[in-house]
Regions:
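Lumenal/extracellular ectodomains and adaptor appendage modules
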Residues: 19-337
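Bacterial N-terminal signal peptides that target proteins for export
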Residues: 1-7
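N-terminal signal peptide c-region/cleavage motif recognized by signal peptidases
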Residues: 13-15
Length: 337
Protein backbone atom coordinates (compact mmCIF):
# COMPACT_ATOMS: atom_id res chain seq x y z
CA UNK A 1 0.00 0.00 0.00
CA UNK A 2 1.30 3.43 -0.89
CA UNK A 3 1.89 5.68 2.06
CA UNK A 4 1.47 9.42 1.90
CA UNK A 5 4.41 11.73 2.07
CA UNK A 6 4.02 15.48 2.36
CA UNK A 7 6.68 18.14 2.65
CA UNK A 8 6.55 21.91 2.18
CA UNK A 9 7.14 24.12 -0.95
CA UNK A 10 6.31 27.66 -2.23
CA UNK A 11 4.39 30.14 -4.59
CA UNK A 12 3.76 33.57 -6.12
CA UNK A 13 0.47 35.45 -5.78
CA UNK A 14 -1.84 35.31 -8.81
CA UNK A 15 -5.62 35.35 -9.16
CA UNK A 16 -7.44 32.17 -10.13
CA UNK A 17 -8.17 33.45 -13.61
CA UNK A 18 -4.45 33.80 -14.31
CA UNK A 19 -3.60 30.21 -13.51
CA UNK A 20 -5.07 28.73 -16.68
CA UNK A 21 -2.96 31.06 -18.83
CA UNK A 22 0.23 30.51 -16.86
CA UNK A 23 0.23 26.73 -16.78
CA UNK A 24 2.69 24.49 -18.63
CA UNK A 25 1.87 20.81 -19.04
CA UNK A 26 4.53 18.18 -18.50
CA UNK A 27 5.33 15.20 -20.72
CA UNK A 28 5.50 11.95 -18.78
CA UNK A 29 8.67 9.98 -19.57
CA UNK A 30 9.86 6.71 -18.10
CA UNK A 31 12.77 4.33 -18.35
CA UNK A 32 13.85 1.75 -20.88
CA UNK A 33 11.47 -0.81 -22.36
CA UNK A 34 12.68 -4.30 -23.21
CA UNK A 35 11.12 -6.79 -25.56
CA UNK A 36 9.77 -9.41 -23.15
CA UNK A 37 12.55 -11.79 -22.08
CA UNK A 38 12.13 -14.30 -19.26
CA UNK A 39 15.85 -15.10 -19.15
CA UNK A 40 16.93 -11.67 -17.93
CA UNK A 41 16.20 -10.31 -14.48
CA UNK A 42 16.65 -6.78 -13.22
CA UNK A 43 18.96 -7.22 -10.27
CA UNK A 44 18.74 -3.57 -9.27
CA UNK A 45 17.45 -0.18 -10.33
CA UNK A 46 18.68 3.11 -8.89
CA UNK A 47 16.40 5.94 -10.00
CA UNK A 48 17.23 9.60 -9.31
CA UNK A 49 14.82 12.39 -10.24
CA UNK A 50 15.17 16.16 -10.07
CA UNK A 51 13.88 19.04 -12.16
CA UNK A 52 17.25 19.08 -13.97
CA UNK A 53 17.88 15.40 -14.67
CA UNK A 54 16.49 11.89 -14.51
CA UNK A 55 19.17 9.23 -14.08
CA UNK A 56 18.53 5.50 -13.96
CA UNK A 57 21.23 2.92 -13.24
CA UNK A 58 20.09 -0.60 -14.06
CA UNK A 59 21.87 -3.87 -13.30
CA UNK A 60 20.63 -6.84 -15.32
CA UNK A 61 21.48 -10.52 -14.93
CA UNK A 62 21.24 -13.03 -17.75
CA UNK A 63 20.26 -16.21 -15.91
CA UNK A 64 20.56 -18.46 -18.94
CA UNK A 65 23.59 -20.34 -20.29
CA UNK A 66 23.37 -18.55 -23.64
CA UNK A 67 23.88 -14.96 -24.70
CA UNK A 68 20.65 -13.01 -25.09
CA UNK A 69 20.32 -10.38 -27.80
CA UNK A 70 17.48 -8.07 -26.82
CA UNK A 71 15.73 -5.18 -28.52
CA UNK A 72 15.73 -2.21 -26.14
CA UNK A 73 13.57 0.87 -26.64
CA UNK A 74 13.11 4.27 -25.04
CA UNK A 75 9.60 5.42 -25.96
CA UNK A 76 9.02 9.16 -25.83
CA UNK A 77 5.61 10.56 -24.94
CA UNK A 78 3.30 11.48 -27.79
CA UNK A 79 3.33 15.18 -28.61
CA UNK A 80 0.20 16.69 -30.16
CA UNK A 81 0.15 20.19 -31.55
CA UNK A 82 -2.63 22.66 -30.81
CA UNK A 83 -3.61 26.27 -31.23
CA UNK A 84 -2.49 27.02 -27.68
CA UNK A 85 0.49 24.66 -27.39
CA UNK A 86 1.62 24.89 -23.76
CA UNK A 87 3.85 21.87 -23.16
CA UNK A 88 7.25 21.83 -21.51
CA UNK A 89 9.78 20.67 -24.13
CA UNK A 90 13.15 20.22 -22.36
CA UNK A 91 15.53 21.03 -25.25
CA UNK A 92 15.40 22.63 -28.70
CA UNK A 93 16.88 19.58 -30.47
CA UNK A 94 14.00 18.11 -32.53
CA UNK A 95 15.75 14.73 -32.73
CA UNK A 96 16.63 14.51 -29.04
CA UNK A 97 14.25 16.75 -27.14
CA UNK A 98 15.04 15.08 -23.81
CA UNK A 99 18.84 15.12 -24.18
CA UNK A 100 18.71 11.32 -23.97
CA UNK A 101 22.01 9.47 -23.28
CA UNK A 102 22.62 5.80 -22.49
CA UNK A 103 25.65 3.64 -21.80
CA UNK A 104 25.80 -0.17 -21.83
CA UNK A 105 28.62 -1.60 -19.73
CA UNK A 106 30.33 1.78 -19.84
CA UNK A 107 30.10 2.32 -23.60
CA UNK A 108 27.81 4.91 -25.22
CA UNK A 109 24.80 3.48 -27.02
CA UNK A 110 24.12 4.51 -30.62
CA UNK A 111 20.34 4.47 -30.76
CA UNK A 112 18.07 4.76 -33.80
CA UNK A 113 15.28 7.32 -33.68
CA UNK A 114 11.91 6.24 -35.08
CA UNK A 115 9.38 9.05 -35.64
CA UNK A 116 5.88 8.88 -37.06
CA UNK A 117 3.18 11.49 -37.60
CA UNK A 118 -0.49 10.63 -37.13
CA UNK A 119 -3.70 12.56 -37.65
CA UNK A 120 -7.13 11.02 -37.00
CA UNK A 121 -5.35 7.68 -36.66
CA UNK A 122 -3.73 7.81 -40.12
CA UNK A 123 0.04 7.73 -40.66
CA UNK A 124 0.97 10.95 -42.49
CA UNK A 125 4.75 10.75 -41.98
CA UNK A 126 5.82 10.37 -45.60
CA UNK A 127 3.39 13.02 -46.77
CA UNK A 128 4.84 15.62 -44.39
CA UNK A 129 8.38 14.62 -45.37
CA UNK A 130 7.48 15.05 -49.05
CA UNK A 131 6.58 18.68 -48.30
CA UNK A 132 9.82 19.29 -46.40
CA UNK A 133 7.96 19.97 -43.15
CA UNK A 134 9.61 19.14 -39.80
CA UNK A 135 7.82 16.35 -37.94
CA UNK A 136 7.72 18.30 -34.67
CA UNK A 137 4.19 19.76 -34.20
CA UNK A 138 5.47 22.94 -32.56
CA UNK A 139 8.12 25.63 -32.95
CA UNK A 140 8.76 28.54 -35.29
CA UNK A 141 10.61 26.45 -37.88
CA UNK A 142 7.64 24.15 -38.41
CA UNK A 143 5.11 26.99 -38.59
CA UNK A 144 7.28 29.10 -40.93
CA UNK A 145 7.67 26.19 -43.36
CA UNK A 146 3.93 25.49 -43.23
CA UNK A 147 3.12 29.15 -43.89
CA UNK A 148 5.46 29.19 -46.90
CA UNK A 149 3.64 26.37 -48.69
CA UNK A 150 1.42 27.01 -51.73
CA UNK A 151 -2.28 27.42 -50.99
CA UNK A 152 -3.14 24.05 -52.54
CA UNK A 153 -0.78 22.28 -50.11
CA UNK A 154 -2.25 24.19 -47.18
CA UNK A 155 -5.73 23.11 -48.24
CA UNK A 156 -4.60 19.48 -48.45
CA UNK A 157 -2.99 19.69 -45.00
CA UNK A 158 -6.26 21.00 -43.57
CA UNK A 159 -8.20 18.29 -45.44
CA UNK A 160 -6.01 15.63 -43.80
CA UNK A 161 -6.51 17.15 -40.35
CA UNK A 162 -2.83 18.04 -39.97
CA UNK A 163 -3.17 21.81 -39.49
CA UNK A 164 -5.69 24.45 -38.55
CA UNK A 165 -5.60 28.13 -39.57
CA UNK A 166 -5.04 30.48 -36.62
CA UNK A 167 -5.77 34.18 -37.16
CA UNK A 168 -4.21 36.89 -35.01
CA UNK A 169 -3.27 40.56 -35.04
CA UNK A 170 0.25 41.28 -33.77
CA UNK A 171 0.03 44.99 -34.57
CA UNK A 172 0.57 44.64 -38.31
CA UNK A 173 -2.95 43.70 -39.32
CA UNK A 174 -4.57 40.29 -39.35
CA UNK A 175 -2.31 37.35 -40.14
CA UNK A 176 -2.98 33.63 -40.50
CA UNK A 177 -0.65 30.86 -39.34
CA UNK A 178 -0.93 27.24 -40.37
CA UNK A 179 -0.81 25.65 -36.91
CA UNK A 180 0.19 21.97 -36.64
CA UNK A 181 -2.26 19.73 -34.77
CA UNK A 182 -0.82 16.34 -35.65
CA UNK A 183 0.55 13.83 -33.16
CA UNK A 184 4.24 12.91 -33.20
CA UNK A 185 5.17 9.45 -31.93
CA UNK A 186 8.89 8.86 -31.24
CA UNK A 187 10.95 5.94 -29.95
CA UNK A 188 14.67 5.27 -29.71
CA UNK A 189 15.81 1.66 -30.13
CA UNK A 190 18.98 -0.39 -30.13
CA UNK A 191 20.16 -3.99 -29.74
CA UNK A 192 21.81 -5.09 -26.48
CA UNK A 193 23.78 -8.31 -26.01
CA UNK A 194 23.53 -9.78 -22.51
CA UNK A 195 26.30 -12.31 -21.90
CA UNK A 196 25.36 -15.70 -20.50
CA UNK A 197 25.34 -15.77 -16.70
CA UNK A 198 26.75 -12.24 -16.48
CA UNK A 199 25.67 -8.92 -15.02
CA UNK A 200 25.26 -5.90 -17.30
CA UNK A 201 25.03 -2.25 -16.29
CA UNK A 202 22.86 0.21 -18.19
CA UNK A 203 22.99 3.92 -17.28
CA UNK A 204 20.30 6.12 -18.73
CA UNK A 205 20.00 9.91 -18.34
CA UNK A 206 17.72 12.56 -19.78
CA UNK A 207 16.31 15.99 -19.02
CA UNK A 208 12.72 15.77 -17.76
CA UNK A 209 9.76 17.73 -19.01
CA UNK A 210 8.75 19.89 -16.04
CA UNK A 211 5.24 21.27 -16.09
CA UNK A 212 3.85 23.75 -13.62
CA UNK A 213 1.77 26.76 -12.81
CA UNK A 214 2.45 30.19 -11.35
CA UNK A 215 0.51 29.69 -8.12
CA UNK A 216 -0.63 27.00 -5.72
CA UNK A 217 -3.86 25.69 -7.18
CA UNK A 218 -4.87 22.81 -4.88
CA UNK A 219 -6.19 24.99 -2.03
CA UNK A 220 -8.97 26.36 -4.21
CA UNK A 221 -12.60 25.36 -3.83
CA UNK A 222 -14.03 22.78 -6.28
CA UNK A 223 -15.26 24.22 -9.57
CA UNK A 224 -16.83 22.86 -12.78
CA UNK A 225 -16.88 19.26 -11.45
CA UNK A 226 -13.18 19.48 -10.57
CA UNK A 227 -11.93 19.27 -7.00
CA UNK A 228 -8.25 20.34 -6.87
CA UNK A 229 -7.66 18.97 -3.37
CA UNK A 230 -9.01 15.51 -4.24
CA UNK A 231 -7.11 15.39 -7.52
CA UNK A 232 -3.79 16.34 -5.92
CA UNK A 233 -4.31 13.89 -3.07
CA UNK A 234 -4.84 11.10 -5.61
CA UNK A 235 -1.89 12.03 -7.83
CA UNK A 236 0.65 13.31 -5.30
CA UNK A 237 -0.54 11.95 -1.92
CA UNK A 238 -0.73 15.45 -0.47
CA UNK A 239 -1.47 14.81 3.21
CA UNK A 240 -2.64 17.08 6.04
CA UNK A 241 0.92 17.95 7.09
CA UNK A 242 1.76 19.11 3.57
CA UNK A 243 -1.48 21.10 3.19
CA UNK A 244 -1.04 22.76 6.58
CA UNK A 245 2.57 23.68 5.77
CA UNK A 246 1.35 25.51 2.67
CA UNK A 247 -1.55 27.18 4.47
CA UNK A 248 0.84 28.62 7.05
CA UNK A 249 2.53 30.61 4.28
CA UNK A 250 -0.64 32.28 2.96
CA UNK A 251 -0.30 36.05 2.89
CA UNK A 252 -4.08 36.31 3.04
CA UNK A 253 -5.87 33.49 4.87
CA UNK A 254 -8.95 34.11 2.71
CA UNK A 255 -7.01 33.91 -0.56
CA UNK A 256 -5.96 30.31 -1.42
CA UNK A 257 -3.69 31.62 -4.19
CA UNK A 258 -1.59 33.84 -1.91
CA UNK A 259 0.97 31.21 -0.87
CA UNK A 260 4.51 32.21 -1.96
CA UNK A 261 5.13 29.23 -4.26
CA UNK A 262 5.01 28.12 -7.87
CA UNK A 263 4.19 24.52 -8.73
CA UNK A 264 6.39 22.13 -10.70
CA UNK A 265 5.19 18.73 -11.90
CA UNK A 266 7.32 15.78 -12.98
CA UNK A 267 5.90 12.49 -14.27
CA UNK A 268 7.90 9.27 -14.45
CA UNK A 269 6.25 6.45 -16.41
CA UNK A 270 7.35 3.22 -14.76
CA UNK A 271 4.48 0.89 -15.67
CA UNK A 272 5.81 0.21 -19.21
CA UNK A 273 9.03 -1.51 -18.16
CA UNK A 274 7.80 -4.78 -16.63
CA UNK A 275 9.23 -6.95 -19.40
CA UNK A 276 11.97 -8.79 -17.55
CA UNK A 277 11.97 -11.96 -15.47
CA UNK A 278 10.46 -11.43 -12.00
CA UNK A 279 10.56 -8.32 -9.81
CA UNK A 280 13.36 -5.78 -9.44
CA UNK A 281 15.72 -7.34 -6.91
CA UNK A 282 16.62 -4.01 -5.30
CA UNK A 283 14.91 -0.74 -6.13
CA UNK A 284 16.20 2.61 -4.88
CA UNK A 285 14.56 5.97 -5.55
CA UNK A 286 16.00 9.42 -4.83
CA UNK A 287 13.94 12.56 -5.43
CA UNK A 288 15.54 15.99 -5.10
CA UNK A 289 13.27 18.99 -4.49
CA UNK A 290 15.93 21.50 -5.59
CA UNK A 291 16.06 23.99 -2.72
CA UNK A 292 15.79 23.40 1.04
CA UNK A 293 12.98 25.97 1.12
CA UNK A 294 10.91 24.09 -1.43
CA UNK A 295 8.18 21.62 -0.54
CA UNK A 296 7.61 18.24 -2.17
CA UNK A 297 4.93 15.58 -2.22
CA UNK A 298 4.71 12.23 -4.01
CA UNK A 299 3.38 8.75 -3.36
CA UNK A 300 5.88 6.25 -2.01
CA UNK A 301 6.41 3.58 0.61
CA UNK A 302 8.66 4.19 3.62
CA UNK A 303 10.11 7.37 2.13
CA UNK A 304 12.83 8.98 4.25
CA UNK A 305 14.34 12.46 4.18
CA UNK A 306 18.08 11.88 3.70
CA UNK A 307 19.38 15.40 3.12
CA UNK A 308 18.38 19.06 2.92
CA UNK A 309 16.70 18.45 -0.46
CA UNK A 310 16.61 14.67 -0.96
CA UNK A 311 14.05 11.99 -0.17
CA UNK A 312 14.66 8.29 -0.70
CA UNK A 313 12.90 4.96 -0.66
CA UNK A 314 14.30 1.45 -1.02
CA UNK A 315 12.41 -1.75 -1.77
CA UNK A 316 13.31 -5.37 -2.48
CA UNK A 317 11.54 -7.65 -4.96
CA UNK A 318 9.81 -4.55 -6.29
CA UNK A 319 7.18 -4.51 -9.04
CA UNK A 320 6.44 -1.04 -10.48
CA UNK A 321 2.75 -0.26 -9.97
CA UNK A 322 0.55 -1.11 -12.94
CA UNK A 323 -2.21 1.29 -11.91
CA UNK A 324 -0.29 4.52 -11.38
CA UNK A 325 2.81 6.38 -12.48
CA UNK A 326 5.23 8.30 -10.28
CA UNK A 327 3.87 11.84 -10.07
CA UNK A 328 5.99 14.42 -8.24
CA UNK A 329 4.79 17.81 -7.01
CA UNK A 330 7.39 20.42 -6.11
CA UNK A 331 6.45 23.80 -4.66
CA UNK A 332 9.17 26.34 -5.43
CA UNK A 333 9.58 29.03 -2.79
CA UNK A 334 9.45 32.54 -4.22
CA UNK A 335 11.48 35.23 -2.51
CA UNK A 336 9.75 38.56 -1.78
CA UNK A 337 10.60 41.32 -4.23
Amino acid sequence: MLSRLGFALIVAVFPASALANDTMAQLGVGGLTFLTNDKIEMASEDLSISAEQVKVVYEFKNNSDADQRVLVAFPLPDITGSGDFMVSVPTEDPENIFGFETTFNGKPVEATLHQYVFSVGIDQTEYLKSLGIPLTPYGNDTIEKLNALPDEDKQELMHRGLVIPMEYDAGQGWQTDMTPVWTLKSTYSWEANFKAGALAEVIHTYKPSVGGTVGVSFLAEPYEDYDPATSYKKDYCTDDAFINAVKKTLKDKNDPYSAPFTESWISYIWSTGNNWSGPIGRFHLTVDKGSPENLISFCGTDVKKTGPTTFEMTATDFFPPYDRELEILILNRQQPE
